[in-house]
Amino acid sequence: MKIMVLNGSPKRETSDTMCMTRAFIKGMNEAGENAVHTIHLIDRHIEYCTGCFSCMKNGGECIHKDDMKGLLEEILESDLLIFSFPLYCYGMPAPMKAFIDRTLPLSSMAMRKVGERYEHVEQADFSHLKYLMICGCGFPNSQHNFELAVAQFKLCFPNHHTIITVPESPMFNVLEAAPVTKPRLALIRQAGRRYAESGKIEPELLEQICSPMIPEDVYAKIANGEA
């Protein structure tokens, strides 16, 4: 399987969320070796979409001549896109949002109705492509935190998507937190293996992964410097 990892964190490899992403990929590779290419979007030259729609009218050619041309070509050659990013103001960091905006050349001006919504018709066949979102945040729980990012991801990629959201994720880069983070990374690694084998993750396993690692009030006290 060809996997394109899109890291939206400005921290690159030291991202808390990338700790989870690496564990997931390690699990996938246990089920069979994959070709993995990790891209730190902060290091790529990606201009902002101007909304001119030129790309939708001329076969996908964007007015900007930057790194997106090569990234779009790689998307078409991939089997799985992993969107790895921390929660910024309840949504995606700017590098990730700029990247997604610039995938517009993969769509055409034509629209079709799917259920109750209208969507643009693709300019290529994406039926084989799967999408995985891995997102961490520094809050003690998930309630009223991830909803915006999750909703946007589902709208952008309505088919073949899987979503992992984990609170208290800054602990993944704290050595003293290893007694609680290592078991969680082991679960994420297990999820990667299951995903590679079956294309899905059991709801029970997802629930374990997405739950707080330590009691919410304890985490809040540590974050506030009260413990």
Predicted regions, residues:
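N-terminal beta1-alpha1-beta2 submodule of the flavodoxin-like/Rossmannoid cofactor-binding fold
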Residues: 1-108, 182-227
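Hydrophobic anchor at the start of a short beta-strand
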Residues: 3, 35-36, 131, 160-162
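Short, glycine-/small-residue-rich phosphate/pyrophosphate-handling segment
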Residues: 95, 108-160
